[in-house]
Amino acid sequence: MTAIQNFFKTFFLTELLKGLALTGRYTFQRKVTVQFPEEKTPISPRFRGLHALRRYENGEERCIACKLCEAVCPALAITIESETRADNTRRTTRYDIDLTKCIFCGFCEESCPVDSIVETHILEYHGEKRGDLYFTKDMLLAVGDRYETEIAANKAADAPYR
């Protein structure tokens, strides 16, 4: 009996007609698709995108070379080298993040005691070569300087949940 039913379903194209009816029903309804490059959807305040290093208001970089972010990184994407200055404070001489290894978990941001390393809302970045996704200290500081107002606003919005 089922073989005969299957024959008539396929012979009279009932599945095809059901699919066309469904398509026709949704053709004239409001669209939910976003045309991405031209339209942007709202981003969560907790979105984790491109990394940035922040500075204090006086221009000095925040990183104290505690290396907690390097230790907590599960992907081993962060490399830090530091030196002790004349006033017995440590500062980084090298701070590199390999974004080809990074899984954007946010552990580096959570472990930083001085809020030096942050993940911004920047999601549109690319590289033509693998080396283009290897961010050095100067590149990370440049991102932080450029987007400091946005970073500070996002930190303030997220403050009640931290």
Swiss-Prot record:
SUPFAM superfamilies for this protein: 4Fe-4S ferredoxins
The record's free-text note on cofactor binding: Binds 2 [4Fe-4S] clusters per subunit.
Residue positions binding [4Fe-4S] cluster 2: C73, C102, C105, C108
Gene Ontology biological process terms, A to Z: aerobic respiration
GO molecular function term, any single one: iron ion binding
ATP-binding found in the keyword field: no
Top-rank lineage group of the source organism: Bacteria
NCBIfam families hit by this protein: NuoI (TIGR01971), PRK05888.1-4 (NF004538), PRK05888.1-5 (NF004539)
Stated family: Belongs to the complex I 23 kDa subunit family.
Protein name per its UniProtKB record: NADH-quinone oxidoreductase subunit I
Gene encoding the protein: nuoI
